[in-house]
């Protein structure tokens, strides 16, 4: 499908950058649409911590191309012993296969998106109040987001936004940017191709700096991490 991007006039944007394909493409879209971009990554003790290395590498690459992104990695790894999930260190084995399989529930991290959302909202509100200008939170949500993750559902997002607006002053200057709402991973990747051309950056140089795997494999010969091509996130990326 052809994505219809709602192009923004707002100056400021805050994005949660996981280091995966979706959020990395969203970062490129934000760079194109906004004057200033703040990107946040979270270390919550995830096994696939290589995604944070990829996120930093992408930021560094974009800086060399003249794109100044304010970037912060936020340490939440003190939670690792308190969270029950296959995705965190000390958790069960990460299951393989498609998201639709029941065993994928093991990859749910309790309240993860709410934790990330609260911090992202706080930063966006701080930017909005400091500048006195409209600030958007960019979300990479898309039609392929899965019901197995309750915090990817529209009902959850609506309730989360309601809580944010009820719990803070001066929230009228904070909005949302969701360019991929009606698309899937294939559409996101196609938009990435367009954005790389528009921003005059190399597609391969960008996406080699991403990780979409819950079970990345370390190659001791090259000292590089590679996708396992078996975990659900990796299977979806290959299918795209």
PLM features: residue spans?
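Glycine-rich phosphate/adenylate-binding loop
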Residues: 197-218
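Local cysteine-cluster metal-coordination motifs and their immediate loop/turn environment
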Residues: 118, 122, 211-239
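ATP-dependent adenylation/nucleotidyltransferase module used to activate substrates
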Residues: 1-203, 234
């Amino acid at each position: 499908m052809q994505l219809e991007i709602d192009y923004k006039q707002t100056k400021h944007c805050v994005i949660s950058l996981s280091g995966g394909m979706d959020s990395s493409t969203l970062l490129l879209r934000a760079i194109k649409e906004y004057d200033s971009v703040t990107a946040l990554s979270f270390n919550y003790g995830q096994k696939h911590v290589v995604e944070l290395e990829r996120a930093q590498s992408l930021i560094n690459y974009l800086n060399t191309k003249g794109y100044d992104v304010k970037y912060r990695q936020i340490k939440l790894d003190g939670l690792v012993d308190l969270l029950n999930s296959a995705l965190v260190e000390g958790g069960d084995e990460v299951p393989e296969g498609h998201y639709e399989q029941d065993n994928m529930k093991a990859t749910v991290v309790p309240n993860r998106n709410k934790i990330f959302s609260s911090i992202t909202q706080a930063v966006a509100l701080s930017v909005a109040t400091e500048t006195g200008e409209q600030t958007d939170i960019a979300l990479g949500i898309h039609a392929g987001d899965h019901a197995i993750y309750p915090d990817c559902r529209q009902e959850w997002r609506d309730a989360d936004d309601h809580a944010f607006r009820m719990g803070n002053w001066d929230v009228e200057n904070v909005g949302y940017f969701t360019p991929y709402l009606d698309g899937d991973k294939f559409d996101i990747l196609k938009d990435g191709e367009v954005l790389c051309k528009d921003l005059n950056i190399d597609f391969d140089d960008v996406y080699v700096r991403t990780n979409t795997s819950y079970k990345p494999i370390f190659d001791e010969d090259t000292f590089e991490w590679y996708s396992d091509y078996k975990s659900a996130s990796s299977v979806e990326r290959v299918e795209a």
